[in-house]
Regions:
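PLP-dependent amino-acid enzyme catalytic core
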Residues: 1-398
Length: 398
């Protein structure tokens, strides 16, 4: 049973193991709101997951520890379990979906855990972990549907109240619901007036779907850049806690998540993974009313592959009007390309990529299409460049 005493016990157990992460003021992210970021992306292993994993490990019996542990994860729980097992001298086997970022896979191995890659998503890794548990006798460490794990995550709430006792609202990412269950239970127990907002990826709204339907329905599929919260079904324990203590759940798109990752990098010099940035995305795009409030966004993790990061940055630039691609119909004659680039330069745009295609089906046989990528200041700047091109007779293709 989850109790506030258990959360305090977890805090004691984590002393000297998990960092007390900073709550950083972020005035530029959400004007009109006194917004703070709880930087669990700077936690040991790069996410909050060490808290729950380590506390769970301390609650195991000697017999369970001797058998070794097995866990399944989208990546961050894997690292938390691997490091916790290493610190306690326990064998750990981790089942990861084969689409997990390479950085998370390699980090898990670096802590000494045995990694088993499973085809599919988190739920497939979960089934494989249960199979190996039954075959080998390992102790299974659930990533979210476990009282001890939830209590460990709840220690974040104790720190938030210590750092910002006057906080009005807290925004928390949701995957399976372990993080928000621990935070919501603890905050509502100690300060019932606080508003708790859960944030899910639009492509993986398992908790929102379950609460709206009043049952633990399993999503047929999930698709999001926020791999850490790409979960098809919440747990029964997290479902019950969220139904009692969470005020509202909202969703954010992949484009909004990308914009949030970019904003965190530019304004706060922080790197967040997709799952870690959903709370900030909800604040940025006004998914909940935070005007005049003191609010905290839990940035739950920062383990993102640099290859994914580059794609996310490009997506974020497009979302914020800092980049655009124009398709321009040209006559196939000398000087046309020069004319286009000169107009763009005169308007202060910067060309980063050009593709010149000869006549294609449906176009003028004497024409060609120019696909050009620009760096711009904002959406108004893009419209200014488009208008200048059209005034000089160039035709833009939608």
């Amino acid at each position: 049973m989850l109790t506030i005493e258990k959360v305090y016990d977890a805090q004691k157990a984590l002393t000297g193991v998990a960092r007390k992460t900073d709550a950083i003021y972020a005035p530029k992210l959400c004007p009109g709101t006194e917004l703070y970021l709880k930087t669990e992306n700077l936690q040991v292993t790069g996410s909050f997951k060490l808290r729950g994993a380590y506390y769970k490990m301390t609650c195991l019996s000697e017999e369970e520890r001797a058998r070794g542990v097995i866990a399944c994860s989208a990546g961050n729980h894997a690292q938390g379990v691997a490091l916790a097992a290493q610190k306690n001298g326990i064998k750990a086997v981790i089942c990861l979906p084969d689409g997990a970022p390479i950085s998370k896979v390699e980090a898990t191995k670096s802590y000494g855990a045995e990694v088993c890659l499973v085809e599919g998503v988190y739920d497939d890794a979960y089934q494989k972990a249960l199979q190996l548990r039954d075959e080998k006798g390992y102790s299974f460490l659930h990533p979210f549907n476990d009282v001890d794990v939830i209590a460990g995550q709840g220690t974040i709430a104790l720190e938030i109240l210590e750092q910002l006792p006057e906080v009005d609202a807290v925004l928390v990412p949701i995957g399976g619901g372990g993080l928000i269950s621990g935070i919501a239970y603890t905050l509502k127990t100690l300060k019932p007036s606080i508003k708790i907002y859960g944030v899910e990826a639009k492509g993986a709204p398992c908790m929102k779907n379950a609460l709206e339907h009043g049952s633990l329905e399993k999503l047929p599929s999930v698709s999001t850049i926020a791999d850490g919260i790409a979960v098809k079904q919440p747990g029964d324990l997290t479902y019950d806690i969220c139904s009692k203590y969470v005020d509202e759940i909202v969703t954010v798109t992949d484009d909004e998540i990308s914009a949030a990752i970019l904003a965190l990098m530019e304004t706060q010099k922080l790197v967040a993974e997709g799952a870690g940035a959903v709370s900030v995305a909800a604040a940025l795009f006004n998914k909940v009313d935070l005007k005049g409030k003191k609010a905290v966004c839990v940035v739950s993790g920062g383990n993102i592959d640099v290859t994914i990061l580059s794609r996310v940055i490009n997506r974020g630039l497009l979302m914020s009007g800092r980049s655009c691609e124009l398709h321009i119909e040209l006559l196939d004659r000398p000087g046309q390309l020069k004319g286009v680039t000169q107009i763009i330069a005169d308007q202060g745009g910067n060309v980063t990529s050009v593709r010149h295609e000869r006549a294609s089906e449906g176009s003028d046989v004497n024409g060609c299409c120019l696909r050009i990528v620009l760096e711009t200041r904002n959406f108004e700047h893009i419209e200014q460049i488009k208008k200048a091109l059209q005034e000089k007779g160039f035709k833009l293709i939608d």
